[in-house]
Regions:
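Non-catalytic accessory regions flanking glycosidase/transglycosidase catalytic cores in CAZymes
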Residues: 1-223, 228-237, 261-262, 266-303, ...
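Active-site His/acidic residue clusters
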Residues: 241-257
Length: 505
């Protein structure tokens, strides 16, 4: 199979916001307890955090982590999670029908984020609470000193403010499963007033308005237009959530699901711009795709979980090779929309539908989806270029034209990086033509290929991972490479001529 790309340095989508590679940790299952925090584990530091997990998270180059939920946040009293640990109450978590000990709270999570080099994206409870609790939390976290809440933070051991800059106005408030579920009109008014109060405390923060819980919601579209119309002037981002699965065990159909994500992003972008035009506003609302991933493997086992346990295993999907391929396609799709998608959170980070898994009495390990995400987060920084791609297509029941080649290019001062997925069951000879670009040569060609599509990683057996390929050549303004059957590929090239752009006269 043959495919071509034309990459021009002047055809740019936009700059990659590093927060595109964010993630999410919820007080749910073993994400926190036995995930990031396990004081009796051999690798635990003096604060009780697993250093093997810290090491794997740092490898992912994650800039920001959404916290503490998720459905959990709609019943969360943030005051329960501060002060002496011994005095913190145990609470029923109605979202996941477990018991929350509050042993890890705001201070502990902030300290863990310092270890992994990430900021917090804090969600506030707009299910059972509202304006007052939210503005008090901003004061507690961000106000320097001299008030009740800021001085309480200082007395709890944090002299300087946490300085949290990104805040979510609740979680999935359109969902009937949500504690405190609201209509679009109810939520829009509450979100507007909550954002207003929060920004009166700290006018440097940015806030995310809840969009639909997924594209299949019966209120999708109407919800977005209603809440945006109400809260537009007070908010900065609109959220999107979507998970994908291969319940039909149809690989071709499954690998096309990224086209659904592409359509979803385009639709929500259009809604934001519709309300902007209606209001004659100069303000642009960008997108926060703050829950996305693959989620379907664990559905049946979770139905059998007994209620009211502390940190039971929940949503511990074992990801396989085909999941890694789709995740690569989803990452490429997010990059294609880097002009409007400024935040995206892989949900979640540890144990719960996560790239990292832990053994209670053993080690932490990388799932198959870890590798595409890590490579994109490390190498996909800079400006996204919009290539012209020619590739054969196939059809599914949902999409008439699915390209066998899914690809995008990112450029920075030193490198041109091409991310590519071959969806096909034939090898692909890819020829990349360069316009206004000059290369010194290829730095590396990494590929994930040749695995059984159902192959998974296990503790001490991370066999589904990238390897180095020599099937690449760059010369005469072209890059030629062989993309193996069903493969995730990363081609890194060194730029010349002061960033690689040829001087134009």
């Amino acid at each position: 199979m043959e495919a071509t790309m034309l990459i021009s340095s002047v055809k740019r989508v936009g700059k990659v916001d590093p927060r595109l590679y964010s993630s999410f940790i919820e007080h749910m299952g073993r994400a926190v307890y036995e995930g990031i925090y396990q004081p009796d584990h051999p690798s635990a530091n003096k604060s009780g955090f697993r250093q093997d997990v810290i090491h794997l998270v740092k490898e992912l180059n994650i800039p920001m982590i959404r916290y503490p939920g998720g459905n959990f946040v709609s019943g969360f009293r943030w005051e329960d999670s501060i002060g002496p640990i011994a005095n913190r109450p145990r609470r029923l978590d109605l979202a996941w029908r477990t018991i929350e000990t509050n042993e890890v709270g705001i201070h502990e999570f902030y300290n863990w984020c310092q270890h992994v080099g990430a900021e917090i994206n804090m969600a506030v409870n707009l299910g059972t609470r509202g304006v007052d609790a939210a503005r008090n939390l901003v004061e507690y976290c961000n106000f320097p000193k001299g008030t009740y809440w800021s001085d309480l933070r200082r007395s709890n051991g944090q002299e300087s403010p946490f300085g949290i800059k990104t805040w979510c106005l609740g979680n999935e408030m359109d969902g009937p499963w949500q504690i405190g579920h609201k209509t679009a009109e109810e939520y829009g008014r509450l979100a507007e007033e909550t954002a207003k109060a929060m920004k009166l405390v700290d006018d440097s923060i940015e806030v995310v308005l809840c969009g639909s819980s997924n594209r299949q919601m019966p209120t999708f579209g109407d919800w977005e237009l209603t809440v945006l119309d109400q809260a537009y002037d007070q908010i900065d981002y609109l959220s999107l959530h979507q998970y994908y699965g291969n319940q039909k065990n149809d690989l071709s159909h499954y690998l096309a699901r990224s086209l659904d994500m592409d359509r979803f992003i385009s639709e929500v972008t259009a809604m934001c711009d519709t309300v902007k035009a209606k209001k004659h506003s100069k303000k642009q609302i960008n997108l926060s795709f703050d829950e996305w991933n693959i989620w379907y493997h664990s559905a049946e086992q979770d139905e059998q979980a007994a209620p009211w346990q502390i940190a039971p295993p929940l949503l511990e999907d074992n990801y396989n090779f085909e999941d890694a391929l789709l995740l690569g396609c989803l990452l490429i799709t997010l990059l294609k929309h880097a002009d409007r998608v400024k935040i995206a959170c892989l949900a979640q980070l540890v144990n719960v539908i996560a790239p990292i898994r832990t053994e209670t009495n053993g080690e932490a390990w990388r799932q198959t989806i870890y590798y595409p995400f890590m490579q994109a987060a490390v190498y996909g920084q800079g400006e996204v270029l919009s290539p012209q791609i020619r590739s054969a297509n196939y059809a599914t029941e949902d999409f008439e034209e699915v390209p066998y080649l899914e690809s995008i290019a990112v450029i920075n001062d030193k490198e041109l990086v091409i991310f590519a997925v071959n969806r096909g069951e034939e090898e692909m000879n890819l020829t990349v033509h360069l316009s206004e670009l000059s290369l010194e040569g290829v730095i590396d060609f990494s590929e994930m290929s040749g695995f059984d599509t159902k192959a998974t990683n296990l503790p001490k057996s991370e066999q589904v991972k990238p390897s180095h390929s020599t099937n690449v050549k760059a010369e005469d303004g072209k890059i030629n490479c062989l993309l193996k059957t069903l493969s995730w590929n990363v081609v890194r090239c060194r730029l010349s001529d002061e960033g690689g752009t040829k001087n134009e006269r």
